């Protein structure tokens, strides 16, 4: 019984250390993701503008197609 308790204590200790290291690494990764560079902001704005223009063009082409075919 005593050796079983020692084994469980050792597993708990090693698991706690591993979990602690993972949390520290995850925290370091999250810190890097917070800062956005100016390039990323510009890229996001350009993508938004491009997608909006694309949706408008598709909508206009659908209306023109509908008028020509008589939907």
Curated annotation (Swiss-Prot):
Residues 1-22 form the signal peptide. InterPro entries: Antimicrobial_frog_2, Frog_antimicrobial_propeptide. Pfam families: Antimicrobial_2 (PF08023), FSAP_sig_propep (PF03032). GO terms for biological process: defense response to Gram-negative bacterium; defense response to Gram-positive bacterium. Its main location: secreted. Expressed by the skin glands. Belongs to the frog skin active peptide (FSAP) family. Ranatuerin subfamily. This is Ranatuerin-2Va. It comes from Odorrana versabilis (Chinese bamboo leaf odorous frog).
